[in-house]
Amino acid sequence: MARAVHRSGLVALGIVTALMASCAFAAKDVVVAVGSNFTTLDPYDANDTLSQAVAKSFYQGLFGLDKEMKLKNVLAESYTVSDDGITYTVKLREGIKFQDGTDFNAAAVKANLDRASDPANHLKRYNLYKNIAKTEAIDPTTVKITLKQPFSAFINILAHPATAMISPAALEKYGKEIGFHPVGTGPYELDTWNQTDFVKVKKFAGYWQPGLPKLDSITWRPVADNNTRAAMLQTGEAQFAFPIPYEQAALLEKNKNIELMASPSIMQRYISMNVTQKPFDNPKVREALNYAINRPALVKVAFAGYATPATGVVPPSIAYAQSYKPWPYDPVKARELLKEAGYPNGFSTTLWSSHNHSTAQKVLQFTQQQLAQVGIKAQVTAMDAGQRAAEVEGKGQKESGVRMFYTGWSASTGEADWALSPLFASQNWPPTLFNTAFYSNKQVDDFLAQALKTNDPAEKTSLYKAAQDIIWQESPWIPLVVEKLVSAHSKNLTGFWIMPDTGFSFEDADLQ
């Protein structure tokens, strides 16, 4: 006789089974809320750290930097340098494929470095690679790179996030459109890029490191408003958020489901002054503006204490950084200097910001108020990524509208040259690089060039000090603060953190 089975039992069993399956195979999808939009997914053509950080989803370099900014091997196994400092021979890992099935080998490295070092391609990061004379594929796992002249920081250039290995087949297929079609050796591949809303990446099944990645997808979502970014974390709409609004840090820290992190930074915040334009061509005006800003108050008002007043033009944690006596807040002295410079009643100018998130807005408002106290009327504009690319990065000195410009810089190579040359060398005015002060001093240029020709630490220290002494004295900047990096994440997200250069490390990220 057949046993009777009640329908209600079958239904209950089905529900339990479905729930168990759901738990066992729940997708590990992470949403990361970031402070601004992305300009491109081509690391060689991006000037902003965020775009390059997101590009690490798809791309890897020959070398990289760990969270202490120390050099590590990635797609390379080792390297040697010739005695004259001209030739770098790099041994590559074997058996790695790009996401389109193309082999990663010496020919692929050559294709990327040939593209990067060709000025005809007009890539924004060209200056990193302009010293490459030629790249040769000696055999499938050996690359020889010959420089035009000794460049002691070159291996750090190869570790820069811009030096990504892109599939040569994809480069040939997409050409100048490669920024919309990333194909690398990284742990994730592109799923969707909605240019006004998000970039979503998905697990690359053929990734060469066993057991990785652990996440199924990451959605990078730009959220300009600080409060909205923090709210997304609290409601579970996002699992990681950076930057965290400083004024909300204490509140988030009390949330039992969220972990708040304040980590070291090499992010220097500053205001450059266009020294080729009146009144900023007058050293007394630049000195006056440095006296006009109350940096300790700025730390409290805009950064809620998560920053320190700048004591130089290079963050202290970068090798060869020099520290100086901080600029005191002295509005009386500022007004005296303005009078001596021929501006007893002050002047009107513009103050632009490279970002439009809430913290940048606070810095602009604070600075505007401080300048007003010494008679300077500043019209402020907070730019989005597209405006910055068009109006600041894309225009040369003659057509540039930049006067005062609030921005930040992190030396993503982890060494002093990249903290100084892109921002102060004469050849690095926009659109070449990011010398938005349009500063030029032959002695500084010479000292920076000489420092790259020696591997002697004592000589490098002397040369970098001499350059920084001149820059500090001539004041093309108003150095403001060095940030602390405040991020937060759901406690069930592990292995995801902020690098000192404000990039991200997420290769080992997992959702528990």
Swiss-Prot record:
What GO biological process terms does the UniProt entry carry, in alphabetical order? dipeptide transport
Any signal peptide, and if so, which residues?
1-26
Q: Which Pfam families match?
A: SBP_bac_5
Task: Give the record's GO CC terms.
Answer: ATP-binding cassette (ABC) transporter complex; outer membrane-bounded periplasmic space
Q: Which PROSITE patterns match?
A: SBP_BACTERIAL_5
Q: Which InterPro entries match?
A: Peptide/Ni-bd, SBP_5, SBP_5_CS, SBP_5_dom
Localization per Swiss-Prot or TrEMBL: Periplasm
Q: Name one GO molecular function term.
A: peptide transmembrane transporter activity
Keywords recorded for this protein, A-Z? Periplasm, Signal, Transport
UniProt superkingdom: Bacteria
Q: Gene3D superfamilies given for it?
A: Dipeptide-binding Protein, Domain 1 (3.90.76.10), Dipeptide-binding Protein, Domain 3 (3.10.105.10), Periplasmic binding protein-like II (3.40.190.10)
Subunit text: The complex is composed of two ATP-binding proteins (GsiA), two transmembrane proteins (GsiC and GsiD) and a solute-binding protein (GsiB).
Q: What is the role of this chain?
A: Part of the ABC transporter complex GsiABCD involved in glutathione import. Binds glutathione.
- Stated family: Belongs to the bacterial solute-binding protein 5 family.
Indicate what this protein is called per its UniProt record: Glutathione-binding protein GsiB
